[in-house]
């Protein structure tokens, strides 16, 4: 209701001529235009009940007689007397208020901190908790893996946004309700007989947009709630009974059929469907034919070790002849003859050089000859001994080989290459 109020100045007795429209539903009367007048909104609570609400108060300018400026008539037409007005207004309004400030300055508005403390009390601050980005129960993050072996799923005809094919293709998490019989027929209608490009070997869908589009004719009100979580286990969407293998796929052409009797045959054109299960697995190669390794002959190895040790003893006896007794050479010769007698019956040493059978009586002659030679050398042949020490070890070996009556005829020198090969 729009009321035209006519305000008269009672002291002057003249009309001000100010007419204003006033809507009481929109404008709650507040006396906040004067200096330090009711800035906290106390006028809204109980003071206006004392003054009848049927007679709203309108003030243009603050004046000395601010409480005397009241409308002449109320809505019901009853006149207010000046005595009743002054008694009601002054006693009820100015009793608790100090209109004029001591300094004459208008009061400053409350600070932000005071407003915050007033708007949010201390009792409620104990219940308030700081917001933290917690893990959402509705949307769970799905790791996105890129697949470079093929393109992306084409856009469906009804305008559904295209999905990029990846191994983490996911559907609503609460999909276990799809196993109810009311959803199975609709799923059979929507999911074609073609394995889905994105689901890892198990999620059958005719086209990608068809599985995501809401069912135009839901059976029993069943449709995929796409507002739910978009991550779920892929085992919930394996429906082997709805998608039989195609007619041209045989166990010979698709060997997955024999291995997966319960599941779906994976499309051979999509080699990366199961790449999340094959991370770091190399492609199997045909086994190479390994050559038969020769067995180890331990007896022959022992003979080779004895041969090497005996030859090294012979060389040491030749080099360090000055610091050794003359019987060291005889002992090394005995070990060499023992090695020859223990060799193979074909008369061949492990080095492969042909050796004649040893003559037993010549060994005694050699022993006596060696003793006589050592005695003669110890008596007076010091010059020959020095020459023999300073000479080549090969020539000394030839001299001793000739002295032994070709007991082990190695053609005058050792076959080093054969020894190294063995």
UniProtKB/Swiss-Prot annotation:
Residues 193-225, 243-269 are annotated as: Disordered. A motif (Nuclear localization signal) lies at residues 282-285. Its main location: nucleus. Belongs to the FAM53 family. Keywords: Nucleus, Phosphoprotein, Wnt signaling pathway. This is Protein FAM53B. Residues 244-269 have a biased composition (Low complexity). It holds the Pfam family FAM53. It is found in: Nucleus. The modification Phosphoserine is found at residues 119, 168, 170, 180, 213, 269, 335, 344. Interacts with CTNNB1. Acts as a regulator of Wnt signaling pathway by regulating beta-catenin (CTNNB1) nuclear localization. One of its GO terms (biological process) is positive regulation of canonical Wnt signaling pathway. One of its GO terms (cellular component) is nucleus. It comes from Mus musculus.
């Amino acid at each position: 209701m729009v009321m035209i109020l006519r305000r008269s100045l009672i002291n002057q007795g003249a009309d001000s001529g100010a007419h204003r429209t006033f809507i009481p539903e929109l404008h709650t009367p507040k006396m906040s235009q004067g200096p330090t007048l009711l800035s906290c909104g106390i006028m809204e609570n109980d003071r206006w009940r004392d003054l009848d609400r049927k007679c709203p108060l309108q003030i243009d300018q603050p004046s000395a007689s601010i409480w005397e400026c009241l409308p002449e008539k109320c809505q019901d037409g009853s006149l207010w007397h000046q005595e009743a007005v002054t008694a009601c207004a002054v006693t009820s309004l100015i009793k608790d208020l100090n209109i004029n400030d001591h300094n004459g300055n208008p009061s400053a508005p409350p600070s932000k901190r005071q407003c915050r403390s007033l708007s949010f009390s201390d009792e409620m601050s104990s219940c308030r908790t700081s917001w933290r980005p917690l893990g959402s129960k509705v949307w769970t993050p799905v790791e996105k893996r890129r697949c470079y072996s093929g393109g992306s799923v084409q856009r469906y005809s009804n305008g559904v946004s295209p999905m990029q094919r990846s191994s983490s293709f996911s559907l609503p998490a609460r999909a276990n309700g799809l196993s109810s019989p009311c959803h199975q027929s609709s799923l059979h209608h929507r999911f074609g007989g073609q394995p889905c490009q994105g689901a890892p070997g198990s999620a059958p869908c005719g086209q990608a947009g068809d599985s995501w589009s809401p069912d135009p004719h839901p059976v029993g009100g069943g449709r995929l709630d796409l507002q739910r979580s978009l991550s779920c286990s892929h085992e919930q969407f394996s429906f082997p009974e709805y998608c039989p293998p195609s007619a041209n796929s045989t166990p010979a052409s698709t060997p997955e059929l024999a291995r997966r009797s319960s599941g779906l045959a994976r499309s051979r054109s999509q080699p990366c469907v199961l790449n999340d299960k094959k991370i770091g697995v190399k492609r199997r190669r045909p086994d190479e034919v390994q050559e038969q390794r020769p067995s180890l002959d331990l007896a022959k190895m022992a003979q080779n070790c004895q041969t090497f040790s005996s030859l090294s003893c012979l060389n040491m006896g030749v080099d360090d002849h000055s610091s050794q007794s003359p019987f060291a050479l005889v002992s090394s010769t005995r070990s060499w003859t023992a090695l020859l007698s223990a060799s193979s019956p074909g008369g061949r040493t492990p080095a492969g050089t042909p050796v004649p059978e040893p003559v037993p009586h010549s060994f005694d002659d050699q022993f006596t000859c060696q003793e006589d030679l050592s005695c003669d050398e110890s008596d007076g042949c010091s010059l020959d001994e020095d020459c023999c020490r300073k000479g080549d070890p090969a020539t000394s070996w030839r001299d001793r080989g000739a002295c032994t009556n070709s007991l082990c005829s190695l053609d005058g020198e050792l076959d080093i290459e054969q020894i190294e090969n063995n």
